[in-house]
Amino acid sequence: MSGPLVLLAAGGTGGHLFPAEALANALSRRGVAVELVTDERALRYGDTFPARAMHTVPAGTPRSGSIVERGGAILRLGFGVLKALRLIRRLKPAVVVGFGGYPSVPPLLAASLLGAPTVLHEANGVMGRANRFLASRVDAIAAGFPLDDAELAAKLTVTGNPLRPKALAAAGEPYPAEDGRLRLLVTGGSQGARVMADIVPAAVAALPEELRGRLVIVQQTRPEDMARVKAIYDGAAVAAELASFFSDLPHRMAQAQLVIARAGASTVSELAAIGRAAILVPLPHALDQDQASNAAVLKATGAAEVVRQEDFTPRFLSGRLAQLLSDLPQLHARAEKAKAAGVADAAERLAELTLRTAGVRPAAVAPARI
């Protein structure tokens, strides 16, 4: 592909790579070449990430561990900057776009030192530490949710969080028809969460028999928790599909009337774009309390209830489920509120900001394939 090159910088986890993938697709439709610089974890996505080339640079997380471990992380970041400097001099990208996490620091810092245009995307409702370090050094900042930061206001644009193609497709699915079944999706993140395995089955087992007989549960469960979770659902005569990973999770979300989940940026953004009611349990003890900030955005719309993990008990959840599952019109109303807050075209908004920052006029946009 000829034309300008955009270099994306993202850590090798789904929370960083999903929005980077969505932007890569949006840029490709505009005739823009995309390459990815990341860490070794992202190599497993090499066959699916829409970039013409992938590059790795050393990176580390200097915020935890012993003094020796933190020192080693800083050294790795330093080596990463040197490697990124060589890479950017060779590639000469029109702009470098970072998606957070410490693996994005070397490429963005190197681009800033070389005077290359830079864009930083913050997915969460509060800026993470790596992004805070980079914020004053970049030319433009895109935010998934509104950020309350007067110092950054001049360079800040709320684009929303770019959605992966499967989530965009799910956003077009209709709300589940009322057929007597009660559809519940339970997910705890890319690897599942033990708290969901500990709390949700016990809460469901305590529901009245009439509700249990109508429930259809899809639950993401860690392999080591699978047997005990299945045993509880079987004992309660509840239909449940369990897996450690669902490749079609956005579609499963669209099929549900209620979702119980953590509050990562991708989860909250997909809940809003698809439009589903939710009970959110933010990950506790996070340094930046990013999930609590994300959950607050959806709570403010009236689409979600937010529960602290310490209050997330079988007794509490069983009571909330009994009330919510007995009032399907309320769940539908909450879904509509979520949908109204969704930003389905976030990838297009971010693509336009990226190209404006680069000073590039894009070619005609090809239709999205979802």
What are these regions (language model features)?
Residues 24-29, 35-37, 41-51, 57, ...:
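Donor-nucleotide binding loops and adjacent catalytic segments primarily
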Residues 33, 41, 112-172:
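Active-site-proximal region of nucleotide-activated glycan assembly enzymes
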Residues 330-344:
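A short, well-ordered alpha-helix in the C-terminal region of glycosyltransferases
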